[in-house]
Amino acid sequence: VELWNEYYASWGEEDGGFSQDFLSGALTKGGDICLYVLDKLKLEYDYDAWVGLLPILNRYEFSGFMDDYEVTAWDWLRENIISYLPIEVVNSAGGITPNLNLYFYSQTPETQYTITENGQFEIITGIQPLDQPIVNHLTIKFCYSLAYDSYQSSIIVDPRITEEQALIVNDPVARLSFQRFGLREEVLELPFVWDLKTAFRIARDKIRVRGLGAKAIEVSATPRYSYLGIGDIIALSSDIGLENHKCQIIGKSWDDNRWRFVLHIEENPIINPRGL
């Protein structure tokens, strides 16, 4: 007869768990967790770039239990931490590098470059929808209890409400999305989030990037545009109806001696008053 016993432990907010290498207290902040895992794995990464973003990444806090012995540390980090931070992670000359996603960081992101379409920076596709479901009503489940196998708390972004409550809020992008597309609901479970502010940040980030639908164009550019990177925001003008339209680079590759860029085109009057 095989017997199986389960044991659970609990501890205070500043007790137990992994501790930080350089500061006192538990390892809970998003940027610190990324640096800790990258360092322990002996991966090549851009230390200065990660440290430079700590003031932003450490606004997101994570806690929880890891009981999956088959998942690798890097896969766990990507799926449970990095995917909820306002960054795009790329491989650069310095190794694994974070690029701040300015669409998450600000409702009205500033452009870094202004470009008018020309023979050296040429749009080669029409505006095409990306395969990304629209969401404007988002329920976030967090505070996962391993002992009870359930989430102990939740928050909701609801575009229909007129008066906000402690755990149910509205959002300008969600409201605009609801007016355009009707109600689009989704539930997101966050097993490593216990902090209320972090839950709200992640909820608004998801609404921000998925509330209005995602469209894209592809650009072919000469080598002189090698300075453009994933995550950069440009003001693009072209004959297809774009006039200083803010776009974000979401893809970059090298093909037949030219750069290929994929630009995210957003129809958001807060950012692009002229529209498409």
Give residue ranges: language-model regions:
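Extended acidic/polar, glycine-enriched regions
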Residues: V1-L3
